[in-house]
A protein has these predicted regions:
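Surface-exposed extracellular loop regions of Gram-negative outer-membrane beta-barrel proteins
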Residues: 75-94, 174-185, 267-269
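Flexible, solvent-exposed loop segments that connect beta-strands
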Residues: 57-61, 102-115, 154-156, 323-328, ...
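Transmembrane beta-strand segments of Gram-negative outer membrane beta-barrel proteins
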Residues: 30-56, 86
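Bacterial Sec-dependent N-terminal signal peptides
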Residues: 1-31, 173, 382-403
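Surface-exposed strand-loop-strand hairpins of Gram-negative outer-membrane beta-barrel proteins
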Residues: 47-71, 101-103, 115
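Surface-exposed coil loops of outer-membrane beta-barrel proteins
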Residues: 138-209
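Surface-exposed loop and membrane-interface regions of Gram-negative outer-membrane beta-barrel proteins
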Residues: 83-133, 154-155
Length: 403
């Protein structure tokens, strides 16, 4: 009863918040903030995400947990001209009540073991060098911008990475034109030295979206293609490690219709998973999933209703709810399964660069069967899990000096 009381409150809460900011026709219409910075300017930039996340998960797919804390990234930003900019600072992650943090990337790699720890706060350096080749093209080195979750479909990217995982770091290329959007990045997560005790690890991602205006400012066709590749490898290591590469591919189509301030969308994605190499980390060598959905957007409020059907599928960066194996019961794998998925998001603009964000997710798992070595056939009735998060975003810059 308590779970459903919380659930009812959240649905009402997200729905009744007032909306003030103008909603863009497409969530692909992002801009590169660096291009708006005046040349020869030194700024102090603060990026803070104070969050409270509660994951009320039920069943044998994954554990429930809560995340109370903040991700604070203060930095100095300098624009040499309208083409080149540098940003350097430090990124700090704090979970309230936690006093010991393992020195590993805060992202899902099940084989990783931590061998060093920090006390009080998880702290890493932050650096970003950007070249604005044109107003529509940007190349960046160092930390990667993933504030928009790379616009990947929900089954491929867990929203929690945005504010709880370490900032991605490597190389990023972005293109944003009226009918084309491209976000390609390489996130280098583990560097190895000679005789190191862990493997070289990186993630490669690509999101390419083609947009076609059927009726200008009214009807738009969007064709997205996404790729996520994770690799474990390396040479001259102290230990016997296997080399393996996993990949997720998503291809889809979406139709957006705009009527005044309301945007209605209908679309579907086909997702594919593959493992190249010998490894016992993941349970499957290949799998698939389908993800049809409808979405309603009114200014800063979005509500999505989706159906998810999968077999032998592994989501590399997504929620465990989109995988065909259990993360809380060892060696339990599920047969072909399906579920209903609901997601609501809202952003309320408070001040220049400051906003209050809220999101809610519901996973309604239908009848589920699976296998676990040494046990009888697992048969479970449907169950409902949900999660919600509230985030206070402060993204603000102060001009220190203009040269």
């Amino acid at each position: 009863m308590k779970r459903f009381a919380i659930l009812s409150f959240l649905i009402v809460f997200v729905s009744v918040l007032p909306a003030k900011s103008q909603f863009c026709f497409s969530d692909c219409e992002t801009c590169f903030a660096d291009t708006a910075i005046q040349s020869h300017s030194l700024l102090f930039h603060i990026d803070d995400k104070s969050f409270f996340v509660d994951n009320e998960y039920k069943g044998e797919k994954t554990y429930g947990y809560s995340l109370p804390g903040f991700r604070l990234t203060p930095s100095l930003f300098y624009a040499l001209n309208d083409k080149i900019s540098l940003e350097a600072g430090v990124s700090m992650l704090r979970y309230h009540g936690a006093n010991r943090y393992p020195c590993v990337i805060y992202s899902y790699f099940p084989a990783w073991q931590a061998y060093q720890f920090l006390s009080g706060v998880h702290l890493i350096p932050y650096f970003r060098a950007s070249w604005n080749i044109s107003p529509a093209i940007q190349l960046s080195f160092g930390n990667i911008d993933n504030q928009n979750s790379h616009l990947l479909p929900e089954p491929l990217y867990n929203v929690e990475h945005t504010f709880s995982s370490d900032p991605e770091a490597g190389v990023q290329f972005r293109l944003n034109k009226p009918h084309q959007y491209l976000d390609a990045w390489l996130n280098w997560q583990s560097f190895v030295f000679a005789n190191d005790i862990h493997q070289e690890t990186f993630t490669l991602g690509v999101n390419w979206q083609t947009k076609l205006d059927i009726v200008k400012e009214k009807l738009r066709l969007l064709v997205p293609l996404s790729l996520v590749v994770q690799h474990l490898g390396g040479e001259n290591l102290s230990g016997d490690f296997s080399v393996c590469t996993w990949s997720n591919i998503a291809a889809g189509m979406r139709l957006d219709y705009k009527h005044n301030r309301l945007i209605s969308s209908i679309g579907a994605d086909y997702l594919y998973y593959n493992q190249a190499g010998e490894s016992d980390i993941m349970h499957f060598e290949n799998g698939w999933a389908v993800y049809p959905y409808i979405e309603l957007a009114y200014q800063k409020l979005k509500v999505k209703f989706a159906y998810y059907d999968s077999e032998d599928f592994v989501s590399l960066l997504g929620s465990p709810h989109f995988c065909n194996f259990s993360t809380n019961t060892p060696d339990l794998v599920f047969d072909r399964s399906n579920q209903f998925y609901v997601r609501a998001t809202y952003s309320y603009d408070i001040y220049n660069g400051c906003s209050f964000d809220a999101y809610f997710q519901l996973f309604r798992q239908n009848h589920l069967t699976g296998d676990r070595p040494g046990f009888d056939k697992v048969i479970r009735d449907g169950f409902t899990s949900f999660s919600f998060g509230i985030i206070l975003n402060i993204d603000h810059s102060i001009l220190l000096k203009h040269f």
